[in-house]
């Protein structure tokens, strides 16, 4: 056995991955219920084993070095395999004693906790953990075996994964209630050709849907402002900075309070699909399989119940 393997411990890898995820020794210590000096000592011991620095500070921000980034990929996979081994042994027990880590695409955070609360009520003994991120993050977590299931929009065709549709995912055009076309019915998208569009960053799910819409309607917006989150876009829409295309499932609160209004553009809502995915090579534990089955059976009904009343006379799920 090499000196590297003799000196390396799973605890060191767990602490390293937690620090990397939070980009903070303090927050990692809080999650792991350790003191900050204990966390720092374990990372220093790991750096001694590796023989290279794993973290550095750039403009006051804790970031991974190149060796640290490489190790993070392997450490995540190792810890994922250990988790799988533990769950495989637990599989001979009861589904109620398992654990699940589910990855949520950012847009789904508006409804997924309430949806999953129904699952945890049925299976109170299951340890459910949630990881949230953008599409790129979820793809990496799936590939690294760091999550069991992923709830996302576009299926992960980049990976050898199993992806199953679970519900409709409508996207709608929204504006301030003070917009001149707020009360217009079934007007053409070209009526918005002079408007400023507030969109997510290129590569995000909602940005991709917007670009498809523009292409299909031979439409070029007068101006596009790129914003980094749905929350920022919603605040900008409320302030009258422009209009946006967003998932209906991000707008429950604002539509109910009247702070944001729907634009009744012909051809909307634009329907996409929610999917639940896992790696083809992954053997789902009884708890994970139970959660997958729950999402397949209940998501469409749940979303229809929660959001169906927000678009009178228009199908949303």
Swiss-Prot record:
InterPro entries in UniProt: LysR_subst-bd (IPR005119), Tscrpt_reg_HTH_LysR (IPR000847), WH-like_DNA-bd_sf (IPR036388), WH_DNA-bd_sf (IPR036390)
Annotated GO MF terms: DNA-binding transcription factor activity; transcription cis-regulatory region binding
Residues of the HTH lysR-type domain: 8-65
Top-level division of the source organism's lineage: Bacteria
Keyword Transcription: yes
Gene3D superfamilies on file: Periplasmic binding protein-like II, Winged helix-like DNA-binding domain superfamily/Winged helix DNA-binding domain
Feature: DNA-binding region: 25-44
UniProtKB keywords: Activator, DNA-binding, Transcription, Transcription regulation
Pfam families: HTH_1, LysR_substrate
Recorded family membership: Belongs to the LysR transcriptional regulatory family.
Annotated function: Trans-acting transcriptional regulator of RuBisCO genes (cfxLS) expression.
Official protein name in the record: HTH-type transcriptional regulator CfxR
Species whose genome carries this gene: Cupriavidus necator (strain ATCC 17699 / DSM 428 / KCTC 22496 / NCIMB 10442 / H16 / Stanier 337)
Gene name of the record: cfxR
